[in-house]
From Swiss-Prot:
PANTHER family: ADENINE DNA GLYCOSYLASE
Cofactor remark: Binds 1 [4Fe-4S] cluster. The cluster does not appear to play a role in catalysis, but is probably involved in the proper positioning of the enzyme along the DNA strand.
Protein name: Adenine DNA glycosylase
Cofactor(s) essential for the protein: [4Fe-4S] cluster
One Pfam family here: NUDIX_4
Documented EC number(s): 3.2.2.31
Site residues (Transition state stabilizer), renumbered to this chain: 143
GO biological process: base-excision repair; mismatch repair
């Protein structure tokens, strides 16, 4: 599990020489490094590009300057700042891990590898990245960029997500990572993957490893790593009810598990007739269909059909008798218990700090534009 190479080994020497000239050294989390800041950045960078992460990281650090501040925040506050970054389980795990550090480590981020790895949302590579970056502990990493560099350099066949291929790549990253200057080396490997050995159109002529890179020698870089076996993306449909009363909109909070867990969303229906039946029950006769759109998750497409209606009754949705939340019955991720869901009238003109699913946020912005004729402050 530890780094095994010498700093003078050809691979490490070439990587570090490149880093000294071209590596990224001015990212926000690289300045005045702390375990908390690097941990936060590493979690945000999981499946998300650096340019996207930077503004989110800066907002988080400003709002929650230390791990205790994050732990003491409500989940709604955390999800609110995460809105738009996607993969919301990361935010929930981040919050859960912060509370564990507060409660079990007196608010001090652990420096033991096993303890870091045991935190919610932290895998082996993330734990190694945190401890190597801040404390220069000799732990290798294996994120997507590093996988690509190693797969091409050593011509490792197979999809990098396959267990036996991943194990092979772990053995290789242990082999090439030096026991000193580990922080610089790991950052360099990520930078080479992001800036030179890119997924498409790699700049092989500029790569410090091209002399011995097998994919470069054989001019077949596109073979490594092999693509994930393709499966057809399922297509699903849902109907959003944008139910307005006195300029406010009814939202409900989803269960913590599953898609959009813990976020506030519009009431959802599996089909249009169910939605219209609910409106009829509430004696709402006028509605407006807004343009449909597609939201794509990592494993399926969701076609969203928004329907807008105004409600004159003083009753909020939780007082309705109709169980309108039998949503997407064939999809466990979309099942919800009406009686346990948290619902309230949300004022987009004076928004509360809650987490919103990105399609919901976009529709609320459209609601403000339609209702008030101006841009939203969301």
């Amino acid at each position: 599990m530890l780094a095994k190479s010498s700093i003078n080994a050809p691979f490490a020497k070439s990587v570090l020489a490149w880093y000294d000239k071209f590596g990224r050294k001015h990212l926000p989390w690289q300045q005045n490094k702390t375990l908390y800041g690097v941990w936060l950045s590493e979690v945000m960078l999981q499946q998300t590009q650096v340019a996207t992460v930077i503004p989110y990281f800066e907002r988080f650090i400003k709002t929650f300057p230390n791990i205790t501040a994050l732990a003491n925040a409500s989940q709604d506050e955390v999800l609110h700042l995460w809105t738009g970054l996607g993969y919301y389980a990361r935010a929930r795990n981040l919050h859960k891990a912060a509370q564990k550090v507060r409660d079990e480590f007196n608010g001090n981020f652990p420096t033991n590898f096993e303890q870091v790895w045991a935190l919610s949302g932290v895998g082996r590579s993330t734990a190694g990245a945190i401890l190597s970056s801040v404390l220069n502990q000799p732990y290798p990493i294996l994120d997507g960029n590093v996988k690509r560099v190693l797969a091409r350099y050593f011509a490792v066949e197979g999809w990098s997500g396959e267990k036996k291929v991943e194990n092979r790549l772990w053995a290789l990253t242990e082999q090439v990572t030096p026991t000193t200057r580990v922080a610089d080396f790991n950052q360099a490997m990520m930078d080479i993957g992001a800036m030179v050995c890119m997924r498409t159109k790699p700049k092989c002529d500029l790569c410090p490893l091209n002399i011995d890179c097998l994919a470069y020698k054989n001019t077949n870089w596109e073979k490594f790593p092999a693509k994930k076996p393709k499966k057809a993306m399922p297509e699903k449909t849902t109907y959003f009810l944008i139910l307005s009363k006195n300029g406010k909109v009814c939202l409900e909070q989803r269960e913590n598990s599953g898609l959009w867990g813990g976020l506030f969303c519009f009431p959802q229906f599996e089909d249009k007739s169910s939605l219209l039946h609910f409106l009829a029950q509430e004696k709402v006769t006028h509605y407006q269909e807004w343009p449909s759109f597609r939201h794509t998750f990592s494993h399926f497409h969701l076609d969203i059909h928004p329907i807008y209606a105004e409600m004159e009754s003083t009753l909020c949705v939780e007082q309705a008798n109709l169980d309108w939340r039998k949503v997407m019955e064939s999809t466990k991720e979309y099942q919800s218990n009406l009686s346990s869901a948290v619902k309230y009238w949300y004022d987009p003109q004076n928004p509360e700090p809650i987490g919103l699913a990105q399609p919901v946020k976009n529709l609320l912005i459209q609601f403000v534009r339609n209702h008030y004729g101006k841009n939203s402050i969301l």
